[in-house]
Amino acid sequence: MQRVLSLDPAGTDMMIALGLESWLVGVTHQCDLPEGIELPRVTRCSIDRSMDSRQIDDHVRQQQSSGTPVVLHDSEAIAALRPDLILVQDLCSACGIIPQHLRLVLESHPQVESMALAPRDWSEILESIDRLGHCLEQPKQAESLVRRLEERRQRLVDNSMQRPKRRSVGLEWLEPLYGIGHWTIELLKNVGLIEQLGEAGEKSHPIDWNRLMEVDPDCLLVACCGLDANRAQEEFQRISKPGQWLKLRAVEMGKILFLDGNRGFSRPGPFLIDRLEEIDRWLTSDSPQRVAMAPEATRQKLSNR
């Protein structure tokens, strides 16, 4: 058994899905662990939780321009955990620890191996799981997990063939407006949601308000990076001006879904399928349970109309 330190929430999710959570010796402040498991958290975030969307965006840009990471790690705590392997993401320096941030730690402890995870689509997510399983000498567990995830995804595709496709726009941030990218667009297509303002595999991108109005999607999905569904809904209500958002057909008709952008689509890991299954149930169910709905003025469930 190896001592694994995960500095990537998606990597932590992979360890848990592989049944190897007992191998973990430490995680980030962002990681979610199974009930009853407590581990040292070796990172912290410089973002004040009281900041609104605009303030958070300004802070992140300021930190990046000065070369200061938004997420900070505790080098002494990492060394004290004596990891054999460190998992780290290599997609976004604004969201977490990247390999460059660990240069001094790894140089000081050359016996420690590191694995950078940077999947940009569903196939690369599965490849990352397989690679991690082989690295930890648990290839059969990884192969089994990959097979089960693919079977679940295919069932969603089959389900979606029984209903009309919907034109959708996904938002990763609200102020300023940013559209979804990477793996999310591809996965949403599996449940019949066709993104109108982004391309699968591409990075998240700024969205022009006029362009959003022009597209006028059938439904709107809000999954703000790092924010849960309730916080995303609060931000939506805060920045919504009378008549502005309501010009969108999706909002006017209540065809809007707030998603957990922290535990959900911001993590390229195995639990993306769970989130996708929740959306599939929401698209086909008459019950509003487990759904964070739109503001009071537009509070209606998304129907099949």
Task: Give the location of each predicted region.
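N-terminal ligand-binding lobe of clamshell/alpha-beta domains
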Residues: 1-305
